[in-house]
């Protein structure tokens, strides 16, 4: 059987074209591509259960992206499953499935599972992509995410983002409020708490490798510590005691340095720390509040916000603090800039005032404002929307969204995701209130 699988998959790489047009997810909203994720064939009951669960995760990943429309299995006409046969394409076209995913799960003598899949174009009747994965049972969800990533990449031309993690601050709804650092899959599954709730914690950040996080903890009202936590071993260590720090550091692409804002003598400035020597280097000067620094993907520039001209605006400087340029020119106050991993856009929070009071907005602008000073675009607004962060492919933004208390319901805070086009806004389910999300890179 394995030889047959390898033979079939070897045919994939001779395919150079297919009927579907590549989806461009920057050009506004497009109709989702209909896709059928067929039942995965299995060699025993354990593999059958695993395959059933994987189909649900793959379908959900593709649906959440907003670019695919999984077709209900109740509509399927063809009854054959697995990857060892050529599909009856006319039957899939009859239910308007442009794409078809067939798969197979086999339990190996080692106890691991071999998972194989093929993505078909039903219009040209050709294979597009396929792969064989070998995973222990406890990693079956990651295998499903990886398959969805492969499908997403083949059809959009961009890397997928499903095999990723989110770290965030979880807050209990009952009094006294308990804040804990929590970790979950990008879709809200596998939620677990990383801190015990005994101290106030804020702004968790992933290290570049995604196997460590850093966060701010208030040991006392006056003592603020930055902690490093190894997600593989669970061990914690103190990076430093930084009086006046308000946000956890953000890390350079090479992982050797980090930037943070620290308040001293009535002013708040941006500092860079060498993680090996723990030496601090001040990057901004003058009076005012300079905060929320974020590196560009190549590490050569830093975006941050500053009220040096009276109202918080966004600025870019070289990573050594030179060549400062203002990049925001609209009305309102700007905060929390986050540079896209692709380097093309910067996301931000913007606060505007009107007759109804303050409105919070999440927006994006081009990272090279000299090319277009009118590139700013608001993609969502609300009573409280803040803390934007990017998917590793730079095509989705995750953020925190809050609602005020009312006579009928208490206030709440949740995590949402939205495409950079401003479409497909959806909630990421968490067991309690949630804020300060941070998106990992694709896992190894």
From Swiss-Prot:
InterPro entries: 6-blade_b-propeller_TolB-like, PD40, Tol-Pal_TolB, TolB_N. It comes from the Bacteria. Pfam families: PD40, TolB_N. It is found in: Periplasm. This is Tol-Pal system protein TolB. Disulfide bonds: none annotated. One of its GO terms (cellular component) is periplasmic space. Keywords: Cell cycle, Cell division, Periplasm, Signal. Its main location: periplasm. Belongs to the TolB family. Residues 1-19 form the signal peptide. GO terms for biological process: cell division; protein import. SUPFAM superfamilies: TolB, N-terminal domain, Tricorn protease N-terminal domain. The Tol-Pal system is composed of five core proteins: the inner membrane proteins TolA, TolQ and TolR, the periplasmic protein TolB and the outer membrane protein Pal. They form a network linking the inner and outer membranes and the peptidoglycan layer. The lineage of its organism: Bacteria, Pseudomonadati, Pseudomonadota, Alphaproteobacteria, Rickettsiales. PANTHER family: PROTEIN TOLB (PTHR36842:SF1), PROTEIN TOLB HOMOLOG (PTHR36842).
